[in-house]
Amino acid sequence: MQLRSSEISELIKYRISKFNAESEMQDEGIIISISDGIIKIYGLNNIMQNEMIKLPEKTFAIALNLEKEIVGAVVMGSYFHLSEGMKVYSTGRILEVPTGNNLLGRVLNALGEPLDSKGDILHDCFSPIETIAPGVIDRLSINEPLQTGYKSIDSMVPIGKGQRELIIGDRQTGKSSLAIDTIINQKDSNIKCIYVSIGQKFSTVVKTVEKLKEHDALSNTIIVCATASDSAVLQYLAPYSGCTMGEYFRDRGEDSLIVYDDLSKQAIAYRQISLLLRRPPGREAYPGDIFYLHSRLLERSARVNEIYVENFTKGKVKNKSGSLTALPIVETQGGDISSFVPTNLISITDGQIFLESNLFNSGIRPAINPGISVSRVGGSAQTEIIRKLSGNIRTSLAQYNELSSFAQFSSDLDDSTKKQLQHGEKIIEILKQKQYSPMSLSKQALLLFAVQNKYLDKIKSSEVEKYENSLLKHAEKKYSNYMEKINKSYIYDDFVIKKLKKIMDSFEFF
């Protein structure tokens, strides 16, 4: 066989023209130590803070410590298959979780993976768990109410859409119950809810899911769960994942509510991670950036304007503002609200609801201390009817508390003092409310009208609960159309006063 040089040269030219010399740059590192879920990696010179690191066997880690030559990362999941000398790779991506309407009614872990055996999630998109909070120009003032369904909160410590209201108290004082009742109260509204459970028993989470399902509120709620048996990194990430899911609705011109139950557990998990990473400990062994841990999370809760929503959706949604309201919960020890994490959260949030053990044990539920509970948004987050009817409630309770402590040392009291004490007792009784029974705006307005116009003076304190139940049944039975109008209008004028007076005057209590 004879080879021609011209054919050989043509073949070589053809092969050269078709040769593809594309290559992919990949940042590579080597594991040099493993301990308690923390890996130290040599290399990865171009890695970002909080970047995902690809490990062998489809495992990932998050880069938290960026030193000169070493990267400290925390493994998400089991780390027993890892060993020193293994190669790892940077991904160039921050951790992302699924978002969208299809998450409603589902129970997820901190990574957005389903835990409820209902199959895979058909998500709209993935979003990074760490995002920059909206700027000052993008925000609106908080002037729309978010009804909790609790008489004591809606009248004295009102919460507005986009607000951050801290719920603080010792264990077993009704913090979670208050937040869950608030979620239940949103079932007939367009407010989407996210409940983030951090460091609780899985059985407790199951009970919460069952209660929401029982009250038809689960279909409007996303449950994000990092239980006590989960790793510290999942407990640390869960609030950020839940916040990202809530931002999906906020940025598209909808209203959403998120509950963090509770952030003291997240702080403990972050302290554990930081100590394992050999970060220098500060007060109560927490790292120096513990304040930033919570501030960057809670600042993402806001009410954003129409321009922000329009720009975010690229013109698909117009003339709509969105909001993300946060109810962070923090647990205190022995009523000490001056400890490190509670004081941090008090300074970050727009108000706080203090729940006290002695009030809870004496039968006052919710066990709110009105003297030190406050909403920094104030009356601007209340409906007109509730604002005008509840104006003197806090003052009356303050006078009652002052007089009741004075009355312990005096046997003879004048008639006016006795009347004030009796009036205060009846206000406390009327503000009591059972769990899982949020109250509509019209019912709250009717009861506050009864308090303001001294209708309760005719009955004994022990009969207030019975009086309340009978009055509400009477209003529902004979004036249901009008009660429904109050729920929609929020206005308090002469016509409303006349109608409320008619309901009260037509009611006979036996």
Swiss-Prot record:
PROSITE patterns: ATPASE_ALPHA_BETA. One of its GO terms (cellular component) is plasma membrane. It is a peripheral membrane protein. Its EC number is 7.1.2.2. Coiled coil: none annotated. It is an enzyme of class 7 (translocase). SUPFAM superfamilies: C-terminal domain of alpha and beta subunits of F1 ATP synthase (SSF47917), N-terminal domain of alpha and beta subunits of F1 ATP synthase (SSF50615), P-loop containing nucleoside triphosphate hydrolases (SSF52540). It comes from the Bacteria. Gene3D superfamilies: 2.40.30.20, ATP synthase alpha/beta chain, C-terminal domain, P-loop containing nucleotide triphosphate hydrolases. This is ATP synthase subunit alpha. It comes from Wigglesworthia glossinidia brevipalpis. The gene is atpA.
